[in-house]
């Protein structure tokens, strides 16, 4: 799945993946990470997610990365911010009220970009990626994160043959395969959510689950 695919989705406003409300699992399970106020949270492939507003309201600094400048601009405009905009070589940076968004390719991130990060929130990143890209994504993420980081990960799982993603199906077994060698994985909850998602029913899905994981990167 090429970068142009996502840029075109934003240009055409084909953003059914965007949630207008705060994700309920975020407020319910974020305390499990035990992140102190004032710490910094990284939100990969952040889009214009309002979850970043909730994180900021918890007195956390937010660092997001997003490919589409339209998404970044929309986030600040729709939430009433007047950001400072700094043009860079690999990333343009937008800053306002403790929220810092880097506009560019996730795979161009370096350790220096995430040096001050204390936790990660991934609701829509891993499930946005096709199977052939997920290993590269998780390898790069774990490579550039500081040690001893906690990650709140939310995934979808459904019979992949019944629908072409995104969002793609990511099973518990795949989470363990992607992250198990370098993190400790704890399944916090799993819910059957098909009846709450008619758009998936309309596409012929017979089963839909959401899982919430707490991942803890190992120090060695």
Swiss-Prot record:
Gene Ontology molecular function: any one: thiopurine S-methyltransferase activity
Enzyme class: transferase
Annotated positions binding S-adenosyl-L-methionine: 10, 45, 66, 123
Catalyzed reaction equations: S-adenosyl-L-methionine + a thiopurine = S-adenosyl-L-homocysteine + a thiopurine S-methylether
One annotated GO biological process: response to metal ion
Cell compartments where the protein resides: Cytoplasm
Family per record: Belongs to the class I-like SAM-binding methyltransferase superfamily. TPMT family.
Protein name: Thiopurine S-methyltransferase
Gene: tpm
